[in-house]
């Protein structure tokens, strides 16, 4: 059978993270590198695994060693969140002061972004016009048709990026996922407590209106997605099934989509839904891509896609014909749904340049550009018209295989801080300044309607939301308030609001608040420049959750 009405199965034994240790990891390194990178007490790691049920002690070691392990178990049993976040909190991701933008200078994405933000054709100095000057030009009738164009509106909004905490909701366990619906009317949050919470975001509200207990959950809900019609949502976990559930109505109807995997321990780390809602795409820990057809009510494809865990999947655009996938082999692959066959699983191309596993992929929505987040502590921007050569793919595979650290509980090795470009790296741009530790941290393009997609934003293992300028590569905003890693981030499709979901158990909504006037925002006349700044005004507060 393809689907069933599933029953609650509890949390299960689960795993302490999304992925098992990488296959092929552990090649020899120099003694100097090992001394630099070794900063984890192996006994503490073992205690953590024992506490989570991932390993068992069978025999040997002596009573003294067992007593020592038990002491660690007892001392840290009530402090899991501190363990999960402490390495990320100590890590200070290096910021790239001089990003290499040479590949972007002659690529069409530069023109696209400048056109979408009203900067195309302007001299560099004019692109930095202050907001008051733009208003002055509009009043003089110098704007097109007497009003701001959509691009100029996006440029105006860039002056008002979220900078203040407007709302917080707290959970008893880690928040794993949090996304806005396509129309921005609903926000969905998934927590390790097996509960999926839905928030009403209409008319400036952010109010919880429904809580749903997830089914067949092992460890945690790992990914969520809305159906295109906005009436249902899907979620995945350490389970053979992807579940779909209704948003509206009195009761909760959970339908389990059976993927029929070959692995005994199976997890779907990433899911996506086609634009017509018919096909569900999943990336799993067995290195395979799965396609489930909801009309046929069965799994229609199981493609051997990567040499290791598939951590990220995405559709390239609204046609849902081109797919992206990324895994722990550090390769991003591009697939054509019309030519995918189980007996001949060949992608149409591959994108190589990362030095460690890929944690997330987001498409720009135009079937051409995408970004990928990676355990090598970088985000890369790709153009699928520039596939990588065999040399580039081999360089990425070799770099990933030679990694001898585990991002879930070890510090980032110092060699990963180096600004190194692999041979054959076909990426357009590399963004540095955020941390990727503990979990599959997400990154995304900013919305097209409000920002012209001129920004890239990401969660961070240090508890921040990091916003990059897409064209310059520089960090334009850091939102800091969480006490553990931020796993997921979501920007409202039409408003200047960002929601962060963190392992500290908090959901935070960030919005713009005028705190003070800055020099470049003041009119240039001496009379206005000397006028006192008004008293700061707080924006309208949000309603408390029910």
From Swiss-Prot:
Pathway assigned to this chain's UniProt record: Protein modification; protein ubiquitination
Polar residues bias locations: 536-546
Keywords, ordered alphabetically: Phosphoprotein, Repeat, Ubl conjugation pathway, WD repeat
Pfam families hit by this protein: WD40
Cited InterPro entries: DCAF, DCAF11/LEC14B, G-protein_beta_WD-40_rep, WD40/YVTN_repeat-like_dom_sf, WD40_repeat_dom_sf, WD40_rpt
Biased composition (Low complexity): 1-19
Keyword Repeat part of the UniProt annotation: yes
Subunit organization: Interacts with DDB1 and CUL4A.
Role: May function as a substrate receptor for CUL4-DDB1 E3 ubiquitin-protein ligase complex.
Listed PANTHER family: DDB1- AND CUL4-ASSOCIATED FACTOR 11 (PTHR19847:SF7)
Name assigned to this protein: DDB1- and CUL4-associated factor 11
Annotated source species: Homo sapiens (Human)
Gene: DCAF11
């Amino acid at each position: 059978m393809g689907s069933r009405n599933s029953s609650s199965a509890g949390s299960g034994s689960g795993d302490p993270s999304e992925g098992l240790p990488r296959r092929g990891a552990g090649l020899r390194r120099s003694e100097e590198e090992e001394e630099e990178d070794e900063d984890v007490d192996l006994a503490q790691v073992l205690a953590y695994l024992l506490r989570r049920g991932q390993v068992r002690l069978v025999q040997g070691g002596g009573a003294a060693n067992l007593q020592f392990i038990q002491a660690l178990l007892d001392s840290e049993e009530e402090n899991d969140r501190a363990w999960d976040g402490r390495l990320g909190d100590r890590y200070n991701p290096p910021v790239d002061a001089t990003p290499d933008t040479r590949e972007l200078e002659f690529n069409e994405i530069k023109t696209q972004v400048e056109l979408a933000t009203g900067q195309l054709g302007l001299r560099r100095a004019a692109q930095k016009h202050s907001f008051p000057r733009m208003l002055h030009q509009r009043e003089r009738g110098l704007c097109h048709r007497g009003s701001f164009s959509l691009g100029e509106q996006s440029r105006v909004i860039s002056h008002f990026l979220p900078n203040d905490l407007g709302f917080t909701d707290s959970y008893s366990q880690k928040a794993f996922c949090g996304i806005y619906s396509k129309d921005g009317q609903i926000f969905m949050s998934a927590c390790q407590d097996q509960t999926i919470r839905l928030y009403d975001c209409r008319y400036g509200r952010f109010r919880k209106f429904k809580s749903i207990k997830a089914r067949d959950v092992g460890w945690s809900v790992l990914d969520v997605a809305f159906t295109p019609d906005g009436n249902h949502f899907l979620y995945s976990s350490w389970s053979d099934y992807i579940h779909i559930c209704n948003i509206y109505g009195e009761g909760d109807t959970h339908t389990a989509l059976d993927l029929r995997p070959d692995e005994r321990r199976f997890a779907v780390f990433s899911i996506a839904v086609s634009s017509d809602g018919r096909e569900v795409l999943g990336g799993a820990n067995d290195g395979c891509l799965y396609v489930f057809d909801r009309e046929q009510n069965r799994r229609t494809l199981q493609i051997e896609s990567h040499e290791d865990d598939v951590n990220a999947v995405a559709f390239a655009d609204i046609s849902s014909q081109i797919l992206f996938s990324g895994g722990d082999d550090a390769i991003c692959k591009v697939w054509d749904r019309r030519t995918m066959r189980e007996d001949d699983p060949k992608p149409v191309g591959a994108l190589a340049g990362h030095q460690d596993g890929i944690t997330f992929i987001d498409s720009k929505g135009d079937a051409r550009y995408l970004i990928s987040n990676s355990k090598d502590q970088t985000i890369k921007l790709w153009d699928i018209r520039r596939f990588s050569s065999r040399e580039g793919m081999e360089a990425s595979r070799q770099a990933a295989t030679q990694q001898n650290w585990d991002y879930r509980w070890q510090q980032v090795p110092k060699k990963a801080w180096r600004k190194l470009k692999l041979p054959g790296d076909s990426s357009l741009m590399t963004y540095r300044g955020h941390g990727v530790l503990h979990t599959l941290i997400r990154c995304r393009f900013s919305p097209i309607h409000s920002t012209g997609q001129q920004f890239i934003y990401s969660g961070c293992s240090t508890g921040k939301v990091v916003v990059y300028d897409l064209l310059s590569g520089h960090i334009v905003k850091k939102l800091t308030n969480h006490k553990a890693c931020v796993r997921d981030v979501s920007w409202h499709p039409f408003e200047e609001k960002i929601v962060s979901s963190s392992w500290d158990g908090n959901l935070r909504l960030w919005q713009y608040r005028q705190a003070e006037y800055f020099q470049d925002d003041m009119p240039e006349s001496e009379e206005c420049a000397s006028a006192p700044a008004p008293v700061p005004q707080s924006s309208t507060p949000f309603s408390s959750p029910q």
